[in-house]
Amino acid sequence: YHNLFIHFNNSFSKNYIINKIKNNYPNKYKQFKYKHNKYELKKFDDIKYKKKICFIKIDVEGYDHLVIEGMKKFLKKNKPIFLIEFNKSNFLRIWKNLKKNYYCYLFQFDKNNFKKLYNKHFNNLMNGKILDKNYSKNSINLFFIPKNLKKKYLKNSGYFF
């Protein structure tokens, strides 16, 4: 377990993580060393980038709407594709900010399915219903693809259509 890094700036407390390690590795948990580091947090919009960013994966345990709020200028200027996990508690706030410039696609990794979401799908998601027999409620990933991205490009990429 060398160089294992656990990020504590999330929804889990340090004690929660330590107890998980104790339970899962009772004979080895004393070998773990714990460090405390402080990091400066910056809004995405305040960071200078040397290269154009075209894809972003956001995984912040339900705080996606805050990340997206802090990157409004970046999204407007760069229009990257990005991926988030569906979270019912903040999805409407996210969609409200993005629907003007983005399409939303549902992707289920274990089935390799990719499906554009329409209003009826959003309603089903928000009501906790399975969209259809090919999609589970457990692992719903959402791709946001800029409306101005050429479909020709997407077709040629081999990933989406």
Describe the function of each predicted region:
Residues Y1-F161:
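Phosphate/nucleotide-binding beta-alpha loop and adjacent structural elements of enzyme active sites
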